[in-house]
Amino acid sequence: MEKYGFPKPNSLPTELQCEVLQWQNEEEMQRQRVLLASLNSTCPNNSEQQRAFESIMNSIHDFTNANREELTEHRFHFIGGPGGTGKSALFKKLHAACRSLGLLITICAATTLAALLFDGAVTAHSLFDYPVEDEEDVDDLNPTQCDIKKERAEFLHEVSVIFWDEFVSNDRNLMEAVLDLFETLWDEPRYFVFVCAGDFAQVSSHSLLCVMTIYMKNI
């Protein structure tokens, strides 16, 4: 930087500080309110989508207004349906609604292509520092764990809502590793609102059983 005439910074902001600066300011919150109004105008919810939107936002409101130290479980919401049923549109509205309220959220997806649909989204492997494995390297008896660094742990600790698109397309070992991570990463277990979207018709019956087992035991 000094080569181009810029002063050398005394320190670099942490990941949490970067996220707060980017999303938790009045200008950005107003932009998200405008975005939400635009989405509602161009792609209004049908009755089922509106019920889902209100139910999830009420759950998020109750969760974020509770004492986090007294919570004892995650809250899961799943938006399911085949392509063209409005999952992505509803997801975008929920993101905008949360950010317009100044909530700190994070968004991940099963693939890079899916992550590109949403502002600030990354792949689930990237968010949770979980390595991409070849199928022959997977060992169910000794599952791979998430390798979260200090800055990412600090950021996740302050997050209220985790949005996860194409949830069912991820390997079950990743999902189990994430849930185990939140039990052991900090001195006390930390709980979150998970809002997941996907199409169960896209996975085999065996994979569906694995996903549903993980999902049901953590409701």
What name fits each language-model region?
Residues 1-219:
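Conserved ATP-binding/catalytic motifs of P-loop helicase motor domains
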